[in-house]
Amino acid sequence: RERAGAVSGWATAGSFEASGSNGNSDKTDVSLSGLAQYLGDNFSNLIVFGSEYGESSGNKSADEQLLHLRHTRTLTVLTDWEYFYQWQQNDFIQLEERDLLGTGLRFKYGVNPNSGLYLGIGGFYESENRGVDGTSQIGRSNVYISYRKTNDKKITFVGTAYLQNKLDEFSDRRAVGGLSVSVPATDNFDFLISVDLEHDSRPPVGIEKTDWTYKTGIGWKF
C-alpha cells in the first residue's frame, strides 16, 4: 500500500480482504495488512504488518503473520541508504519463525507523485526456525525492483520483485513478487486486486517450491 501524499509527518494505509463459502464446501479466509510511515527531512521510518487466517471444512488452511521495520535516509537526489528488521511466521510452509536484519542502497529513477522506479541492492542476516528441521543462520543477498504508476483516472499499479540468494551458495535462492491494482472509490478508500508469488528453491520436505496468492479487498490511506 502507498501512503497518502508526500507531506512530512505521519501517514497510514492498509487493506482488508475476506472470502468465504458455505454449502458443499465451507471456507473462510481473512487477511489484514497496514503500514504507518513518518516522513522527515531526508529520512523516513516505516512500520508494516500483515496477518492472514483461513479455515477449510473446519481445518486451518492459512496462518501467517509478518512485521517489517525500515529506516531510510537520503544520500543524494537519486540514492537512499536503508536498513531493516523483519519477523515472519507461516504454519503452512513449516516456518515457525524467521528473523531478518539487513541493509542496502536504493536507487530512484523518474520519481514523481504519479510514478517511480526503485532498484535496491544489499544483503541481510537470516535466522530461520523450521521446527523439526531445526534452526539455521545464514547470509543472503537482497536485490529488488519496484515500479509504481498512477494513471489519469487515479488507478494505481504497483509491481515488486525480490531475489534473495544464499551468499555462499547461490543455487539456494528465494524469490518474492507481487502485482497490485487499486481503483479509487473515494479520496481515502480503494478497491484492491493483488497477485503474490513466493518461491523457495529448497523448501522443507512436503512443501511446494512455489506459492501463488490472489486477493481482492478494500484499501484505505490517510
Model-derived features with residue positions:
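Detector for outer-membrane/organellar transmembrane beta-barrel domains
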Residues: 114-165
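Predominantly the C-terminal beta-signal and adjacent terminal strand-loop region
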Residues: 168-222
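Glycine- and aromatic-enriched membrane insertion/assembly motifs of diderm outer-membrane
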Residues: 27-88
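Transmembrane beta-strand segments of Gram-negative outer membrane beta-barrel proteins
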Residues: 4-22, 42-47, 157
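Repeated loop/turn-to-beta-strand initiation elements of outer-membrane beta-barrel proteins
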Residues: 41-47, 78-81, 113-117, 151-157, ...
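Residues that define the transmembrane beta-barrel architecture of outer-membrane proteins
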Residues: 26-30, 61-65, 97-101, 115, ...
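Transmembrane beta-strands of outer-membrane beta-barrel pores
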Residues: 18-22, 40, 51-55, 87-91, ...
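Residues on the lipid-exposed face of transmembrane beta-strands in outer-membrane beta-barrel proteins
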Residues: 14-18, 32-38, 69-73, 103-107, ...
